[in-house]
Amino acid sequence: VIEEKLNEGEIERIPVEGVTVTATGASGVVTGITNEDGIISLAVIKTGEYKVAIDITSLPDGVTPQSDRPTELTINFDTGATIGSGERKVSLFVGDDRASGSGRWEQLPQTLVNGIKLSLIISMCAVGLSLIYGTTGLTNFAHGEIVTIGALVAFWLNKYGFGLHLLLAAPFGIAASALAAGLFERQVWRPLRRRGTSLTSMMIISIGVAISVRYIYLFFFGGRNRRYNEFVGTPEIDFGLFGITPRDLGIVIISSVTAIGVAVFLSKAKFGKAIRAVSDNPDLASATGINTDRIILIVWLIGGALAGMGGLMLGASSGVQWDMGNIILLLMFAAITVGGLGNPYGALLGSFVVGMFTELWTWVFPNVVELKTLGALMALVIVLLVRPQGLLGRKERIG
């Protein structure tokens, strides 16, 4: 038994556990309950015609039948229709009607809502990456792994460690990402800067670090996509033109408040002004008495915390997996390039452009949603053709 959901333009299929399924036929009535993989095995002793049906009342809260998909199927179980050693495999689908196909214009409002949500998730991850680039000049390909570790720590506490509600596990995940970012700065990047290592070499090192850490995640976490306890089968709030789950509504609200808070911090707070000063001219900032090493460490901690929050939002939206940070890394780089390299406000604006283009791509080309990242690349190309320095970037003379 599989639940179909329309998630960010793609049809997401999730196994449904605990659903009662019956097979009625020559052997009488045989009943069973699906396991955590949505699978049930029913043993029958006679060949012939069987009706396989879902007990609708056993579906989890928030999971409903699709209007255009049957919840029961009739199969002819005989030697000519068997698979393997006397087995017959049947898939039954439930879930979101929009996942099974509807008019394109009917899907546009939902696509725009998904675009806003994706934009805000990208912005949480990209602002830190932009701040790090602005203060150090480092193109950090390991930033995706900082995104991932926050989601993994929160998942472990939520699912296995203490069974904490996600709202209680989230601060630990955010702190883990901030701590990881701070350790990277103190133990890897600061020593390399003091040795005079070139930015190109440091970028290559970051690629190696990213690959190494990513496969450590795979070894301990495994390759499955998993979900937080609170977000299995959550009901959707129907607003007519579009629907949104309480989970996604929470993502939009929390991300929006955080983005506004970051913008206010950078423009009004003392540390925020110092960060912008170091980003604009590190040598001049140091000459005026600003401790640049301290500011850079603070930038890494803030960037890591924001990345951890972005990872939590991404995990709540699409599930937690070992390479989730790497999956969104291209969108992060596209966002900070579109907005203007090293400009955190540009990262926020660029994230909106990239997120909306990515989701609208799936609306314009619904049959090639696997290539949805092309939407982000198209946004990048179009903006750079018009403004090579990015939307909020500054022109600089080269050579």
Model-assigned labels for residue ranges:
Residues 2-26, 36, 47:
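Short, ordered, surface-exposed loop/turn motifs in non-cytosolic proteins
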Residues 79-89, 291-294, 365-399:
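Cytosolic-side transmembrane-helix boundaries in multi-pass membrane proteins
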Residues 243-320, 349:
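Helix-loop-helix "hairpin" substructures at the membrane interface of multi-pass membrane proteins
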Residues 107-111, 265-266, 270, 298-336, ...:
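Inter-helical junctions in multi-pass inner-membrane proteins, predominant
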Residues 111-155, 183, 187-197, 201, ...:
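Single transmembrane alpha-helix segments in multi-pass membrane proteins
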Residues 163-209, 349-354, 358, 387:
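Alpha-helical transmembrane segments within multi-pass membrane transporters and channels
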Residues 200-268, 292-298, 367, 373, ...:
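Transmembrane helix-bundle core of multi-pass membrane transporters
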Residues 27-43:
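Short, acidic Ser/Thr/Gly-rich low-complexity loop/linker segments typical of extracellular
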